[in-house]
A protein has these predicted regions:
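Hydrophobic alpha-helical connector segments
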Residues: 17, 21, 81-116
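Acidic/His metal-coordination segments adjacent to aromatic residues that form catalytic metal sites
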Residues: 85-89, 143-148
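Amphipathic alpha-helical packing segments from all-alpha helical-bundle domains
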Residues: 125-147, 155-162, 166
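Hydrophobic/aromatic-rich alpha-helical bundle segments in the mid-to-C-terminal region
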Residues: 147-209
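Short, amphipathic alpha-helix enriched in basic
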Residues: 7-53, 61-68, 72
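Long, charge-rich low-complexity segments
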Residues: 200-233
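Internal, conserved structured core segments that host functional sites
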Residues: 102-137
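Hydrophobic core segments within long, regular secondary-structure runs in both alpha-
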Residues: 24, 97-104, 135-142, 184-191
């Protein structure tokens, strides 16, 4: 089943979103042991005193929807954790760095669940769901950073940020340094490499139109990288 069958966060009404949030919070303690499975979802429901009908109402398509909602929840938690006035006072590059970092800080208590989600989405049949989830996160970060581009710049910056999100998340998952200090250094270097507007524009203009998208980072590439790292360990 692909992510095309999953409703996006913008399609959910408040009641369904709240019920999904409640079930997600209940299922998360079980995910490190059971993975993103029906077993973890059902265990969380039992903890909350919910029925199978409640689970079917919230996640009719099962664990895949639960993983997709985890990504949506993380994006909303990221935005809620950032002070809008403080963010507005930063340069655009600093805003992007701050938002990516806050997202990982929000996810830190659930690091093993993130690892399990990456493994789940690395399965080929689930890869489209992972690609769409990362793309949505990139959209939200650029929007929160105040980016209003609607031309080709929008596509290039979005794709480059997807690359930053993927590589930084992989680094973070394997980072054992105190308070993930090495990850924040890695993130700063990645942002410096690919999110300078001048360098982005230069790359886009130097590539013939039909080859632009192929030259940019993609969610699928992130999935392939995760799968190759799993095989290497």
């Amino acid at each position: 089943m692909t992510d095309e069958t999953f409703p996006g966060p913008e399609d959910l009404d408040a009641e369904i979103r709240d019920r999904r949030d409640r079930l997600l919070a209940a299922a998360l303690p079980h995910v490190p042991f059971d993975g993103w499975t029906r077993r973890a979802l059902d265990a969380g429901a039992r903890d909350e005193g919910l029925t199978a009908a409640d689970v079917a109402f919230a996640f009719p398509l099962g664990p895949g929807e639960l993983v997709a909602h985890f990504g949506d929840w993380a994006a909303r938690a990221m935005l809620a954790a950032v002070d809008a006035e403080t963010l507005a006072a930063l340069k655009v590059r600093e805003r992007i760095t701050r938002l990516v970092r806050v997202r990982l800080e929000v996810l830190a208590p659930h690091k093993e669940a993130v690892r399990r989600a990456a493994a789940f989405l690395a399965v080929p049949v689930n890869a489209p769901a992972g690609a769409r989830s990362v793309a949505r996160t990139a959209d939200r970060i650029w929007a929160a950073a105040g980016d209003t581009a609607t031309d080709l710049n929008w596509y290039s910056k979005r794709a480059l940020l997807i690359g930053v999100l993927g590589s930084t998340t992989l680094y973070w998952l394997n980072d054992t340094s105190e308070e993930h200090a090495q990850t924040w250094g890695f993130l700063d270097r990645r942002i410096a490499d690919v999110l300078k507007v001048g360098s982005v524009l230069g790359r886009v203009r130097s590539v013939p139109g039909s080859r632009i998208i192929a030259a940019l980072p993609s969610p699928a590439r992130f999935v392939r990288q995760f799968r190759s790292r799993r095989r290497a360990t």
